[in-house]
Amino acid sequence: MGRSINLEGKVALITGASSGLGKRFAQVLSQAGAKVVLASRRTERLKELRAEIEASGGAAHVVSLDVTDYQSIRSAVAHAETEAGTIDILVNNSGVSTTQKLSEVTPADFEYVFDTNTRGAFFVAQEVAKRMMMRGNGGQKPPYRIINIASVAGLRVLPQIGLYSMSKAAVVHMTKAMAQEWGKHGINVNAICPGYIDTEINHHHWSTDHGQRLVAMLPRHRVGRPEDLDGLLLLLAADESQFINGSIISADDGFGLS
């Protein structure tokens, strides 16, 4: 008999939820029954997504979050729990990139990428985890889930995005360190490493000459869709993933083998 993931009664915080993968993650978790908290700097787009989710029968809340600002992180997490209840699931998705050679990277470029992808991801996870641990110490039984969104670029260096690769490699090892330290508190921390995914942000690129050459180099000559990550996301968010902790899971259609 088949089983479906049921997240009813869970509260999920999704960062970078205003577009791309973050938007899809929020929709999928809501469809599975979770109450979702949508976090981003672009709150107008979050309000549009909230309306879509509510029109489909889901529950959603909007919080303003700048992951490069520590006080914004603390305020957003506190606001999320005031509005929606205690957080059971964090999808740590905010991310940015630049395209350039490492010899051309400026201090401003470095700070731009690492402040969001690494520092921001760390302090969002830390703030949520501290609250999870506090509840655990108070007798509120876990499980809790933190899902960091890394990248295949964090597992292998890709041309022209070396800085991004470095920041996501840090997220990979950050995930393992968090899993090792926080697992005893009932917090499972895992990372998804997406391959090349067609989103609204990069959609135009796949029709360019460079995009077509890249697709031709992929093992099955195709890029993924946001929905290709649905099953993995739901598994890692669910109670059924209780024995998965500290795992770095590629969802790249075999790109890492090429």
Feature locations, PLM:
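Short, small/polar-rich loop/turn modules that mediate ligand/substrate recognition or access, typified
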Residues: 183, 188, 244-246
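Residue(s) in the substrate-gating loop at a strand-loop-helix junction
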Residues: 151
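Short C-terminal tail/terminal secondary-structure segment
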Residues: 2-4, 156, 234, 245-258
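Substrate-binding pocket helix/loop in short-chain dehydrogenase/reductase
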Residues: 101-102, 109-114, 202, 214
